[in-house]
């Protein structure tokens, strides 16, 4: 046994929450150690240690992470610095096996838990919380500079978490939380340019050594590259193991994603994609087909408008990222995109798409002015609940 003295662990107030089909560790900014209250290496080091990364075993045994992109997540919330907003929401996607936290995008699934956490942790004026009803929480999504509105159910003055709303990819029902992503498309002066960074609804994406692909590259909710499943040799009915057990396929998707990121202006050199795993996402789409979901439940072709499979952090997602669902709903609403064409074409205000765990309905209000498409908002329902609250402990730096 070593005689060396080691400092004790520190404890930080935290809440472990499920939001949509993801889980993450939530913090109030004021509860973080002083050095971690500002962006930088101290904050990243703390969050990496909380989650249990980097882990060469890719299991995150020594932390709160669950060794998947859906469960290697952190959230920092504070009173909003923006007028007409309640809370600032900052999301950090923690790499599982590498020492970095990706701050380049939002997590749409955990967005469902932001309002509930803010209400329960004193970030919302108590006078605004009804005894019974719905509390509207205006969220400033600090990663992407966008407004999100969460409608959180309240019973007896507290967040209502239990209910009968069922979400494919989540085993148990809970209370429904409606979320509005306001003006979700990228601004002209934002990173990656406007909603369609290339100016086209469909581009030909040249990927050396792999091929040429028709692609819709959109920045709404989260930057996303959509490709036809057929062009990749898939049907759109694939489940996680079909893709994630194929290292060659994963490498191909990552190469396509990197070239798409370059084409979208998100990176300046192809090598930068390796340290920007959270964005852009890559997904493939197909017309409706019947298939068995990962739970064994049959998804009938007539029950969906299209099929979508998406990768997150280098792996096929078990359901669908909430931000990617915003991109799907937005692209579906705009005639001529690959997503819209897979859903049958024409003008659409909402679609129900099939994903590996089942189906999800998402709506978007899109308008065309002077030949340019804009999206007023995208809407979907998720659920959220507290799994554990108290303190997380980490070794003192």
UniProtKB/Swiss-Prot annotation:
GO molecular function, a single term: intramolecular oxidoreductase activity, transposing C=C bonds
EC number: 5.3.3.-
Class of this enzyme: isomerase
Pathway: Organic acid metabolism; propanoate degradation
Keyword tags: Isomerase, Oxidation
Record-listed substrate binding positions: 22, 69-73, 109, 281, 312, 317, 322
GO BP: propionate catabolic process, 2-methylcitrate cycle
Protein task: Involved in the catabolism of short chain fatty acids (SCFA) via the 2-methylcitrate cycle II (propionate degradation route). PrpF catalyzes the cis-trans isomerization of 2-methyl-aconitate through a base-catalyzed proton abstraction coupled with a rotation about C2-C3 bond of 2-methyl-aconitate.
Note: Together with AcnD, they are able to restore the growth of prpD mutant on propionate.
Complexes and interactors: Homodimer.
Protein name: 2-methyl-aconitate isomerase
Species of origin: Shewanella oneidensis (strain ATCC 700550 / JCM 31522 / CIP 106686 / LMG 19005 / NCIMB 14063 / MR-1)
Organism placement in taxonomy: Bacteria, Pseudomonadati, Pseudomonadota, Gammaproteobacteria, Alteromonadales
């Amino acid at each position: 046994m070593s005689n060396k003295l080691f400092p004790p662990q520190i404890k930080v107030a935290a809440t472990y929450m499920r939001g949509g089909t993801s889980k993450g560790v939530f913090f109030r900014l004021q509860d973080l150690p002083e050095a971690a209250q500002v962006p930088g290496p101290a904050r990243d080091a703390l969050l990496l240690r909380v989650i249990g990364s980097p882990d060469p075993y890719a299991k995150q045994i020594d932390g709160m992470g669950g060794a998947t992109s859906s469960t290697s997540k952190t959230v920092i919330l504070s009173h909003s610095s923006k007028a007409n907003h309640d809370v600032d929401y900052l999301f950090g996607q923690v790499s599982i096996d590498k020492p970095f936290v990706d701050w380049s995008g939002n997590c749409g699934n955990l967005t469902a838990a932001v309002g509930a956490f803010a209400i329960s942790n004193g970030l919302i004026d108590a006078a605004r919380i009804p005894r019974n009803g719905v509390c509207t929480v205006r969220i400033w999504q600090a990663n992407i500079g966008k407004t999100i509105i969460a409608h959180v159910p309240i019973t007896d003055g507290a967040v209502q978490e239990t209910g009968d709303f069922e979400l494919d990819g989540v085993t148990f029902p809970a209370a429904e939380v409606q979320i509005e992503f306001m003006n979700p498309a990228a601004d002209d002066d934002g990173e990656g340019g406007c909603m369609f960074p290339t100016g086209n609804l469909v581009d030909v994406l040249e990927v050396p050594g792999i091929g040429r692909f028709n692609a819709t590259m959109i920045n709404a909710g989260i930057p996303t590259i959509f490709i036809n499943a057929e062009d990749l040799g898939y049907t759109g009915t694939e489940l996680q193991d079909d893709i994630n057990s194929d290292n060659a396929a994963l490498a191909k998707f990552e190469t396509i994603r990197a070239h798409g990121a370059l084409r979208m202006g998100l990176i300046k050199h192809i090598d930068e994609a390796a340290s920007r795993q959270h964005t852009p996402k890559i997904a493939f789409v197909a017309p409706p087909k019947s298939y068995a979901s990962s739970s064994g439940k049959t998804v009938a072709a007539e029950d969906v408008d299209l099929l979508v499979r998406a990768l997150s952090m280098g792996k096929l997602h078990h359901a669908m990222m909430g931000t990617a669902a915003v991109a799907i709903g937005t692209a579906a609403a705009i005639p001529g995109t690959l997503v819209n064409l897979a859903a049958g074409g024409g003008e659409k205000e909402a679609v129900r798409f099939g994903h590996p765990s089942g189906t999800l309905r998402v709506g978007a209000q899109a308008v065309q002015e002077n030949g340019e498409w804009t999206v007023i908002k995208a809407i979907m329902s998720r659920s959220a609940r507290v799994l554990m609250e108290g303190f997380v402990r980490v070794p003192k730096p």
